[in-house]
Amino acid sequence: MLGGHNGAGARHGRVAALAVAAGMWLASGAAAAGEIYLRGGFGLDRPGDTAFMDEDCSSTAPAALYGCGTGGDGAPYRSAGGFGTVPAVGLGLGYAAGAARFEALVEYRPAFAFRGRTNFLAPGRQQSVSANLSSVSGMLAGFVDLGAPGLPELGRLAPFVGAGIGVVRTRIGKTTMTFPTTTTTVPGGTRTGLAWMATAGVAVALGERVTLDLAWRYTDLGAVRTKRGPGRVVWRDGSQEPRPLDLAPTRARLAGHGVRLSLRYVMGGF
C-alpha cells in the first residue's frame, strides 16, 4: 500500500518538475530587466474523493486500524469520503520580466474537514468518520504570459499558464469513527512532503501597478497521514470500560481542482 502511494507521489513530482522546467524554458527569451511584485489573494479547492487506508494492513504491533479484509461494500477496509470545499489564502513575492514571471508563493488552508464512512458494517448502517485539518504550503512557481504578437487578442484579458513545486505541511486532528453502539477515536498527525500545482488563467490590468488574476488551479498536496499512537473505543451506553488501542498510521491523498482570485501590485523595477 505504502509503495503505491510513494510511486504515485514520485510520478506526480516528476510531472510537476518537468512542467516548471518547460515554463522556464519558454520564458527564457524575456528581457533581463524586470519588476518586483507582491501578490495577495484567496481561493477555493475541491479535492477529489479519497479514502483513508492502512499504510500496512497486516501490522499487528501497532495494530492496523482497518486490516486486510474486505468490507460490506466489497472494497478493502477503508474510510471513503471527501474533504469538501477547502478555503485557501495566499501571499507571493514575484519577479516579472517580459513574458516570464517567477514567484515564491505561500498558501495557508486554515480549516477544512474530512467527512466519510467506513465499510466495516453492511451498507446503510451507521459508520461515519470525521476529522478536521489544516495545511500550509510553499512553492516556487513559474508563469508565462501568452499575450504575444500573433496570438488571438482577448481585449483587456491577458491569458497565462504556470506551474510550481514545493513542500507542504498538513495537520489532521483526532479522527472520530461513530458506529451504532461505539465511538472509536484515532490519533491525528502531521506530514511534510512534496506539493505541486499547475494553473491557467487570465489577468486584467486595473491600473499602472495593479493587476487582477483569475485562475484555475490543480493542486496536489500529497498524503494526509494519521500517526502511530493511542486510540480508544468507547461504548456510549457505558456498558463496558473504554478499550485502549495502539494504532498504526493511515493515509489518504489530498489533491484536486480549484480557483484563485488575487491581486498583483508592482513595487518597482530594476
Predicted regions and their residues:
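Cleavable N-terminal export/targeting peptides
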Residues: 1-35, 269-270
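Short loop/turn motifs that connect adjacent beta-strands in outer-membrane beta-barrel proteins
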Residues: 30-35, 147-158, 206-209, 268-270
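Extracellular/periplasm-exposed beta-strand and loop segments of Gram-negative cell-envelope proteins
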Residues: 47-84, 107-138, 167-193, 222-258
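Residues on the lipid-exposed face of transmembrane beta-strands in outer-membrane beta-barrel proteins
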Residues: 40-42, 89-97, 106, 140-146, ...
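Outer-membrane beta-barrel "beta-signal"
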Residues: 35-37, 253-270
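Transmembrane beta-strand segments of Gram-negative outer membrane beta-barrel proteins
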Residues: 33-48, 159-161
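Substrate-binding/catalytic groove segments of enzymes
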Residues: 171-173, 204-213, 222-228, 270
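Transmembrane beta-barrel architecture of outer-membrane proteins
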Residues: 35, 84-90, 101, 135-139, ...
